[in-house]
Amino acid sequence: MARVKRGVVARARHKKVLKLANGYYGARSRVYRVAFQAVLKAGQYCYRDRRCKKRQFRKLWITRINAAVRQHGITYSCFMNSLKKASIHIDRKILAEIAISDKVAFATLAEKAKSILCVT
């Protein structure tokens, strides 16, 4: 049997992990064992937060729409219900953008929603 020397492979693997851990604090960026654990944990956080980001943005859009709609004297739920009844299909992302950038257009949407206002 020929002797198998794995130094090159191990060094390459270690370098790859340490490169991923570049910028981490202390031993996490220098010691392979600690860096490997840090990189694994970072990957878990990354996976989780890619899904969480979608929820966070939806919350942000709803908050922005709610704030803009209340200036016109309507609640968020009433506004969304009225838009649905009026067959105006604009998603929350675009509504939030309109609320910030184009106040006149948003005011017309709010007035349209007020005319079909839900009964509470």
Curated annotation (Swiss-Prot):
Gene3D superfamilies noted in UniProt: 6.10.160.10, Ribosomal protein L20 (1.10.1900.20)
User: A single Pfam family, by name?
Assistant: Ribosomal_L20
Q: Which GO terms describe its biological process?
A: ribosomal large subunit assembly; translation
Q: Which InterPro entries does the entry link to?
A: Ribosomal_bL20, RIBOSOMAL_L20_CS, Ribosomal_protein_bL20_C
Keyword list, A-Z = Ribonucleoprotein, Ribosomal protein, RNA-binding, rRNA-binding
Give the UniProt entry's GO cellular component terms.
ribonucleoprotein complex; ribosome
Which NCBIfam families does UniProt cross-reference here? rplT_bact
Similarity annotation: Belongs to the bacterial ribosomal protein bL20 family.
Q: What is this protein called?
A: Large ribosomal subunit protein bL20
Report which gene this protein is encoded by.
Answer: rplT
